[in-house]
Amino acid sequence: GAGKTTTINLFMNFIQPSSGHVKVNGLDASAQPQDTKKHLAYIPENLSLYGNLTGLENLQFFAGLGGEKPDNSSAENLLQSVGLQSDAVHKRVSQYSKGMRQKVGIAIAKAKQADNLLLDEPTSGLDPKASNDFAQLLQEMRQNNVAILMATHDLFRAKESGTHIGIMKAGKLIHSLDSDEITLTELEHLYLETMKSESHAEVNH
């Protein structure tokens, strides 16, 4: 792969860097993993929640793992603040769509009050409305000074939601762009040219 998920895994200290350092708020993720994780919230592509628990119970459980213990009222407010309908708060997560599960993930991140959010393909498999709702939640978090690193193949969402865009290939950052200085059409062209050069390199190897 390009190395997007590997990059996130380095920040989470799931794997060790072969060289160099990974730092979060000035802390070395390898040398100070517990301190680093206090500043991080992570939402994987397939968020693992307990299907037999309600959205509220999942939020309270996972927030508790992060040292936060929202009461029922606070948990309900958090879930509704990310767009989960009030009648869904007390339903089992096994009845949730992927979009609803992602909203619980954002609520957990908000409950943790982490100032950095890592996302791995968060809009994969979402319908257009759910994807748009998720993008709006990210905008709100960014306005509240949360730094967001999102690994995605969705060029439209990258352009719409990001301030900076990086294109990776074979574990290397090939392009680093200011999202305000490139159009979606230009971004798509650059991405395709980058991927095409990779294919040619493989053929000519």
Question: Language-model segments: what does each one mean?
Answer:
Residues 117-120:
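Catalytic Walker B motif of ABC-type/P-loop ATPase nucleotide-binding domains
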